[in-house]
Amino acid sequence: MSNEKILALDQKLSAQRQEWSTTIRGLAQSLRNINTMEITIADVLSSRQTLVDQIAYINVKIKQQKKTISARYREAYIRYYEYDYKLGEKQKEKFIENDLADDNMILSHLENQLDWLKDSVKTLDNMGFAIRNRLALKDL
């Protein structure tokens, strides 16, 4: 995979993170108004479920990427095993590592996105607790 494709993936994931950050900040701002709490509750729950769906999708993509890396590792190992020059194990590993660098970079981007999405779900869970506490204070 070329650097342009990796850069495009990074930009797409970054845009997704920015969009979710804006959404979560908007939800946090809506916690200030007790009169619109019903809408806020629905939006928090809806956003949380959408994030969970995206986590599932990213998990599938990570599994696919790991499968691709494993297959390419096997192919590269066989190629360097049958190489014209005798290579030591460390040399083979270095060559294979270089061959798989782009695939590993993609995997790293996907895993970082997964971690970020999981943290965002935790943030929305905490908002749910904040809503509950806010409503409990109102009833006092």
Regions found by a protein language model. Name each.
Residues 39-74:
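Short, well-structured hydrophobic secondary-structure segments
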